[in-house]
């Protein structure tokens, strides 16, 4: 859950980071993941997965290492978001049969799709893990949707 003032601050800082055109795009995305991780205490792990064919490929991230460098569409929370064409907010990952454990400390997860601004086609997603049950809600989703839209403008 993120307060309005902090969400606004995060969106403005995300825009500043992403608009630094003198810095390579991948570095800007890594800097953005670092900022979100550091500024939002409930973001234990935050990263981007890019959709390549029928699998998600890990891009820039900050947090504990993960063995999930590639995730098939339909597997876990990330793959389900693509298969169902919708964002996911999972209050307690331990209740999911289809959960791919990236970290034993993870209790909640949010996935927000990154879509092509013109076609709506899925390009990737922002994936965030939290260590508390119920760490994320619609306020996190709304903030991440704005950030995802800003990312999409840079990669299409």
Please annotate each region the language model reported:
Residues 1-66:
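Intrinsically disordered, low-complexity terminal regulatory regions
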Residues 7, 15-18, 130-156:
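Juxtadomain coupling helices with adjacent low-complexity linkers
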Residues 40, 101-107:
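Short loop/turn motifs at secondary-structure junctions and domain boundaries
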Residues 45, 111, 125:
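Short hydrophobic/aromatic beta-strand element in the GNAT-like acyltransferase core
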Residues 51-102:
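Regulatory sensory and allosteric helical modules in signal-transduction proteins
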Residues 53, 117, 131-133:
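Short coil/turn motifs at secondary-structure junctions
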Residues 108-118:
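A short, aliphatic-rich beta-strand micro-motif
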Residues 120-130:
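Sensory beta-strand/linker motifs that couple input domains to effectors
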């Amino acid at each position: 859950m993120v307060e309005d003032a902090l969400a606004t601050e995060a969106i403005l800082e995300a825009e500043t980071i992403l608009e630094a055109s003198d810095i390579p795009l991948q570095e800007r995305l890594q800097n953005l993941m670092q900022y979100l991780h550091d500024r939002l205490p409930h973001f234990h792990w935050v990263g981007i997965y890019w959709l390549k064919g029928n699998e998600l490929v890990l891009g820039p991230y900050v947090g504990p290492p993960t063995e999930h460098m590639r995730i098939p569409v339909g597997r876990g929370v990330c793959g389900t978001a693509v298969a169902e064409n919708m964002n996911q907010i999972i209050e307690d990952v331990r209740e999911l049969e289809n959960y791919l454990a990236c970290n034993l400390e993870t209790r909640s997860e949010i996935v927000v799709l990154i879509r092509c601004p013109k076609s709506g086609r899925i390009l990737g997603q922002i994936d965030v893990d939290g260590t508390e049950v119920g760490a994320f809600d619609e306020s996190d989703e709304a903030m991440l949707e704005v950030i995802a839209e800003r990312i999409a403008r840079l990669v299409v």
